[in-house]
Amino acid sequence: MLAARFASRAFPRTRLYSTAPKRSLKELVTELRSQADVSPIQAGQALKASDMDVSKALLWLEKQRTQSAVKKAAKVADRTANEGLIGTTVLSSGVANGRRVGVRAAMVELNCETDFVARNELFANLLEDITHTAAFISEPANAETFMQPFSMETLQNAPLLSQTKPSQNGKATVSEAMRDLTGRVGEKISLRRALTVVRDPFTSSQPDLALRVAARVHQSVFNPTQGRIGSLALLALKSKRLSEAIASQTFQDDLDKLCQALGRQVIGFPTTCIRSPPGTTDEGALYDQPFSMFIGPGNDQSVGAFLQSWAQERSLVNKDEEQSAGVEVLEFAKWTVGDVV
């Protein structure tokens, strides 16, 4: 008897479970909502339809959301979407960190029905991911121009590749992500156009050549790479001492400042071409415009004259090279939301 009493004191009775205790609906709803952006009522419905299993409830919610998005997309398919934003991304600028690299950039216009949705953060995030996708999957073009239109069909069928959330990559195509956003905001979401500029680095046998891409937008909301007006400009640099110049941090800073000013110039003026046709003066010609968007000395010159002076001041050009060396704008693209394509 003493042994029994000792045993009962030394080893107090505990209740053993063969399975984990059941969790309350409130606890499960809290856990589900931490993983999915749904209301308490929606979370409860999902759990009750999924045997109170959070993993199954997540799948149930995804299925319901997809079905709802498909219905909404079909309902708004015939509507007009002329609002939206233009997004730009530069994955590789051509000159970076003191060396020549390749060029990889893109510009995309994503449309919706109202300015209200265009200012929605979800819309901005989707545009950022689509623009990154276009730049990432594009291949160098064997064409006369560097900037090339990107196929809408190819882009819509491509897996959405996010630069900020790589864990989400491959879970949906671009078109599926657009449809999902329609389900969330209730408006038609459509792609109007996209272009990319992709060029592999120049080889070591071409040490005197480099490219530099400049991106700029105007009227941005959430993201400084998105706005109602967007532009990409491609510059060429040529000099026998280019490698030496690029290695200088001062030169890199000056080049950044120049590119930013050129982007503002293209957007801020009615720029339609780079040079005027021979024997004429075109107000839309970039090189003939006063370089008002450059902050600093020399902005009273035309853009063309300024670029020549800029190259000379940085010893990219000497008297024997004036016709072939320096810095030059090769191409540019300028878009405004809702343009007729």
Curated annotation (Swiss-Prot):
Give any single GO term for biological process. mitochondrial translational elongation
Name its species: Postia placenta (strain ATCC 44394 / Madison 698-R)
Key words, A-Z: Elongation factor, Mitochondrion, Protein biosynthesis, Transit peptide
Instruction: Tell me the Pfam families matching this sequence.
Output: EF_TS
- Family under the similarity heading: Belongs to the EF-Ts family.
Gene Ontology, cellular component aspect: mitochondrion
Name any one GO molecular function.
Answer: translation elongation factor activity
Q: Does the keyword Transferase apply?
A: no
Instruction: Give the transit peptide, as a residue range.
Output: 1-17
- Known role: Associates with the EF-Tu.GDP complex and induces the exchange of GDP to GTP. It remains bound to the aminoacyl-tRNA.EF-Tu.GTP complex up to the GTP hydrolysis stage on the ribosome.
Establish whether keyword Transit peptide is in the entry: yes
Put simply, this protein is called Elongation factor Ts, mitochondrial 2
SUPFAM superfamilies for this protein: Elongation factor Ts (EF-Ts), dimerisation domain, UBA-like
| Compartments in which it is found | Mitochondrion
